Design a protein with these regions (language model features):
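A short, Lys/Arg-rich alpha-helix, primarily the initiator
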Residues: 2-31
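The alpha-helix within a helix-turn-helix
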Residues: 24, 35, 63
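Residues in the helix-turn-helix
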Residues: 33, 44, 72
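Recognition helix of helix-turn-helix/homeodomain-like DNA-binding domains
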Residues: 39-54
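Short, basic-rich loop-to-helix N-cap that marks the start of a DNA-contacting helix
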Residues: 51-64
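Short C-terminal boundary/hinge segments that cap the last helix of small helical domains
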Residues: 67-80
Length: 80
């Protein structure tokens, strides 16, 4: 699985959407239903599945649909 890698001085950061997939299981919603209800593209969902960069607007739509905050769907992982 590819990751978003951001180099910042001596630290590496990756963005993970694993929280999103867990939340979807908890709320009993699949990717197709989320995509349709949130109004996001198939391309955006595919990028999320590969931990690739997506626009903040996509995450905002998903959060609104799932009635959650952004920290409930993604996290930044710091590596040294």
């Amino acid at each position: 699985m590819s990751k978003i890698v951001i180099k910042e001085r001596r630290h590496m950061m990756t963005i993970s959407y694993n929280k999103l997939w867990k939340l979807m299981i908890d709320k009993n919603i699949n990717k197709t239903k989320l995509r349709e209800e949130a109004g996001v593209s198939s391309n955006a969902m595919a990028k999320l599945g590969k931990n690739e960069s997506v626009q903040l607007e996509v995450l905002a739509k998903i959060c609104k649909t799932l009635d959650c905050n952004i920290e409930d769907v993604c996290e930044i992982l710091f590596e040294e």
